[in-house]
Amino acid sequence: MDTELLKTFLEVSRTRHFGRAAESLYLTQSAVSFRIRQLENQLGVNLFTRHRNNIRLTAAGEKLLPYAETLMSTWQAARKEVAHTSRHNEFSIGASASLWECMLNQWLGRLYKNQDAHTGLQFEARIAQRQSLVKQLHERQLDLLITTEAPKMDEFSSQLLGYFTLALYTSAPSKLKGDLNYLRLEWGPDFQQHEAGLIGADEVPILTTSSAELAQQQIAMLNGCTWLPVSWARKKGGLHTVVDSTTLSRPLYAIWLQNSDKNALIRDLLKINVLDEVY
């Protein structure tokens, strides 16, 4: 039996009006009437008596009512349980493109190597801007956010994972800032507050991107420089620090909902080092 037919039957019995039932179910009145006829044909009985606007349950309808309520309640419970089981095996992690490319990609590999403790766990690596990911976290569409900024909402829990160092890199040795075009790699709003002092107040980026891979590939072609994590740049090779530049230490945080049903799992996963070099 189609559960939608029972749902329609229950709504008509509640409102005693085909028009109001149609509005509640976001259907046309003719669609509601058609569903009731289908159910009556399947059961071989009339479920309602219709006298103008006076709609009443027949004796057969009265007998069906408690069974329909039980069936719909059981169906809803089954759907919820199945959905919870499916969702329970999924774990979504969100971060910016640059964080995934420079450090989280390696961490994800370590999570899979340690899957014995979490057999069957399905990871989703989600890439987006921080503002979008915070919204997803708040709406329970994301389990864990990795970011360079501490949370600003009371309903979030957080853990400082460590620090990493950014340095200004270019593709050739012995270069000065004044000789190079600036490529802005987005490391968060709080980094941008210091950016002008680190680069030069009048320096206009020739390119802005959230991808470290893209920025690294473009600096040679654009005679440019960009801020990259030191450990990642060393592994890449072929990169040189700009002579008259400094380094900058950045924090890395894990953020999740305080009342998340995956609190224990999150803390367990965070025991596996996110950063290759933690200090």
From Swiss-Prot:
PROSITE patterns: HTH_LYSR. Keywords: DNA-binding, Repressor, Transcription, Transcription regulation. It comes from the Bacteria. Residues 18-37 bind DNA. The keyword 4Fe-4S does not apply. Residues 1-58 form the HTH lysR-type domain. GO terms for molecular function: DNA binding; DNA-binding transcription factor activity. Transmembrane segments: none annotated. InterPro entries: LTTR, LysR_subst-bd, Tscrpt_reg_HTH_HdfR, Tscrpt_reg_HTH_LysR, WH-like_DNA-bd_sf, WH_DNA-bd_sf. GO terms for biological process: negative regulation of DNA-templated transcription. Belongs to the LysR transcriptional regulatory family. Negatively regulates the transcription of the flagellar master operon flhDC by binding to the upstream region of the operon. This is HTH-type transcriptional regulator HdfR. The gene is hdfR.
